[in-house]
Amino acid sequence: MPHLLVTFRDVAIDFTQEEWECLDPAQRDLYRDVMLENYSNLISLDLESSCATKKLSPEKEIYEMESLQWENIGNLINHHLQYGLGDNMECKGNLEGQEASQEGLYMCVKITCEEKATESHSTSSTFHRMIPTKEKLYKCKECRQGFSYLSCLIQHEKNHNIEKCSEVKKHRNTFSKKPSYIQHQRIQTGEKPYECMECGKAFGRSSDLIQHQKIHTNEKPYQCNACGKAFIRGSQLTEHQRVHTGEKPYECKKCGKAFSYCSQYTLHQRIHSGEKPYECKDCGKAFILGSQLTYHQRIHSGEKPYECKECGKAFILGSHLTYHQRVHTGEKPYICKECGKAFLCASQLNEHQRIHTGEKPYECKECGKAFFRGSQLTYHLRVHSGERPYKCKECGKAFISNSNLIQHQRIHTGEKPYKCKECGKAFICGKQLSEHQRIHTGEKPFECKECGKAFIRVAYLTQHEKIHGEKHYECKECGKTFVRATQLTYHQRIHTGEKPYKCKECDKAFIYGSQLSEHQRIHKGEKPYECKQCGKAFIRGSHLTEHLRTHTGEKPYECKECGKAFSRGSELTLHQRIHTGEKPYTCVQCGKDFRRPSQLTQHTRLHN
């Protein structure tokens, strides 16, 4: 079988003259070492003693070169590296018929002599012109002998390793060639001879060091044609391109889930096997990923290496800092296709989408209740266990979650960091602000499946859904039933006349605290709910909602008797009295009844 033609140029990295001059001595030495290592890998392919190659001429004459010594080739390569790869080689030997290709050294090296030598040499002789001896930087670890070139050291170490062949065979992985053996040996010994001058990180292979140094230089030579994103390694680009193609070649045999990256597939399998090889020495908690353990250990150490330059807030994870910075920039790149709502991070979008799909994958084994989020289940389990690990130092009150404690502590400090840009109202937590902003936007994302009524908060929807179910709380005075005990309590005040919420300005009293809050806006002149269409402002959010219907023409309240529609529920109530004949407002003077209080007011003026 004929030998395949493989050139050293196929595995070499070239520099132009200008690029070569820009390299400092340390970089040139590193480059030299890498080229020698690459050549060592080539020379290990059973072509050390003899090889055949075709002469690059029309005649295609075959030249045979036998017994070409490995050390001579190493010196020749060193000569190339010292003066830059690609330069013409010179020698004083009489080697007519051989040539040095500018396209790269063939494995069975061809050398052209431009000057005829005075002495005669055979093709198997060593080169007449050798590289000047330089400092012997390369030391043998076995006998401490020094060498000028790494190639000579590798060949020398080969002689030592002949004695250890019997031991090497006992290993699972055996290597017949020197470079592979050296790399394998470093894996077992943990030796990392290639150290980064920038950060001190060490590597077992010089090629790994070169890749690592691109982090410091910010060099990313591999660019994606689809989105322009650049990468340090070609393998990273290959994996990234699967994002655009949608290719997921790694499929789990257990559940059928597919992955773009092999590493993702490997980690996923630990979910099925339950393997958690990374254990915390402080608390014994185990993790699937080593990075998870690293982040977890920062909880014990209190280390937060990622700090926001805007506000100084620090984080355990770099991803948390990235998400936090979007609070300052306002960037929300993850948009829900169902409702258009945007989010800071992908996990928030995934959790939000479960509202539309109704998916609740986290189920409590105690009571069967299911949740959108895993954290919700964790907190819920503490309801059964009674565990409240987060305690307030001010009042001793304990909480299920740390976030609840932080929010509670703001009651003592008076801190309200979340401020509405529309009306300036401030809140203790971000959730309250988000819910409040829906008053201005009119958004009601939580809809009742029974009647279609929508709400600002999920808590309101939960309360409303009880209307369609049983009503356990009944008023003994009038027989009216209620879903909640608090509703019954407020209702009973109508019969008792109790109005515990009193205005300090005018002594007017109210049944509900919310009524007092709204009333106090009259004294302050505060109208926080403003219409974006015409600028008209209102004391109550419900008044704004009703007003907006004058612009949209919406009339959601329809009479079942005649089909007439109204923009307000109160208008429908008054209208229905026409059909029922109900007249609840009676004149004290003459006993006449009226449907509306305004009609009674006008009538009483006749008596006066």
From Swiss-Prot:
CDD domains (UniProt xref): KRAB_A-box
Pfam families: KRAB, zf-C2H2
InterPro entries with a match to the protein in the record: KRAB (IPR001909), KRAB_dom_sf (IPR036051), Znf_C2H2_sf (IPR036236), Znf_C2H2_type (IPR013087)
GO cellular component labels: chromatin; PcG protein complex; transcription regulator complex
Subcellular location: Nucleus
Zinc finger boundaries on the chain: C2H2-type: 138-160, 163-188, 194-216, 222-244, 250-272, 278-300, 306-328, 334-356, 362-384, 390-412, 418-440, 446-468, 473-495, 501-523, 529-551, 557-579, 585-607
Source species, domain of life: Eukaryota
Keyword Zinc: yes
Span of domain KRAB: 6-84
Membership in a protein family: Belongs to the krueppel C2H2-type zinc-finger protein family.
Function: May be involved in transcriptional regulation.
Record's protein name: Zinc finger protein 571
Species of origin: Pongo abelii
